[in-house]
Amino acid sequence: MLLKIPFAKVDCSGNEWIYVQEVLNSGWLTTAGKTHLLEKQFSEYVGGKFACAVNSGTAALHLALEAIGTGPGDRVLVPSMTFTATAEVVRYLGADPVFCDVDYATRLVTPAILKDALLHQPEIKAVMIVHFGGQAAEMETILPFCRSLGVRIIEDAAHAFPSRRRGKWVGSFGDITCFSFYANKTITTGEGGMLVTDNEALFKRCKVMRLHGIDRDIWDRYMSAASSWEYDVIAPGYKYNMPDVAAAIGIAQLEKADLLRQERERCAKFYFNNLADMDSIDLPEVRESMADHAWHLFSIVLNERSRVPRNRFIELMAEKGIGTSVHYKPLHRMTYYRERYGLRPEDFPNTERIWKGCVSLPIYPTLSDEELVYICKSIREILG
């Protein structure tokens, strides 16, 4: 029997409808009480002092780089194996991304890769550390090394909620951590994101810049003891604020974040148990506990022993009704970055090896055991 299994599926089985209805009934749909509540609850969850909700993970990355003073002439280290947003926000500010390779087994920038890149690339202002797939990078080593060189760290945690490293949540490590709440992420607001930092000055800058550079947002003005229309513009900011309708969904998602993560881990364990004996597949390597991984992605690599090319594999999976994806076509292969910076595939050997065979399998909380059996059976039939 042919099943129809999408690559991603949102779980809105909690209080999403109730909280959205509360917002609609309130008559206040833009940034207000629900957004502030989500910021408070999210910062408490990850152990950061301050949180600033925005309308996308890309906006979070942009604000983070702006807050640390990134501008024309600056250089920011970015892995080639990431989504374009990680690099494009560098260009928004007139700075230049400098691209590096990643570890083959984890897709992470390791301390060794980072040290080599920073020692051979002069005047790097900041590093974008991507916690790929839901697994945290080795922040306990990366942080002190970067700080010893005066290099700032922005964590791209679009995949990494909730993730831990050595007992600490992602969101409690570096200068600023940026999360995404896009529709296919581990928790969602449809579109949305969050910055978390322990630095009050950075937080205040992000909060001002997310709404046109205005020193007081409308909810602050409305809720103040002496309600006032008056405000000041202290910088040319952006329109990045999160509306309360989105925040309402986020609050409901956050309530069940632990359960959602556990269910994704269940799927990951099923894949490991049922695909580990296939020598034509390289499974993702988990460096810490399975329970510390957010499991946003389960990305396999069809290695040199696979008789079926990656693109044909995706086509055959689709014929069986199974959605898959690719994470990612590397940035050094994208026309803009390749041509502007003269990037060559041979300078990114691990990324190239990953890219040629990587396929992301469905992994979401409502994926049933029957569907997981069907996916694994289909993979075996295709690869032989």
Task: Enumerate the language-model features and the residues they cover.
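N-terminal "arm"/small-domain region of PLP-dependent enzymes with the aminotransferase-like
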Residues: 1-29, 231-234, 362
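Helix C-cap/helix->beta junction micro-motif
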Residues: 93, 148-149, 320
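Conserved coil-to-alpha-helix start sites within the AMP-binding
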Residues: 82-87
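PLP-dependent aminotransferase class I/II
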Residues: 35-40, 48-51, 112, 126-130, ...
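Active-site phosphate-binding strand-loop segment of PLP-dependent enzymes
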Residues: 105-189, 194-202, 309
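Short beta-strand->loop structural element characteristic of the AMP-binding/adenylate-forming
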Residues: 96-106, 325
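Phosphate-binding glycine-rich loop
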Residues: 28-75, 89-93, 99-101, 168
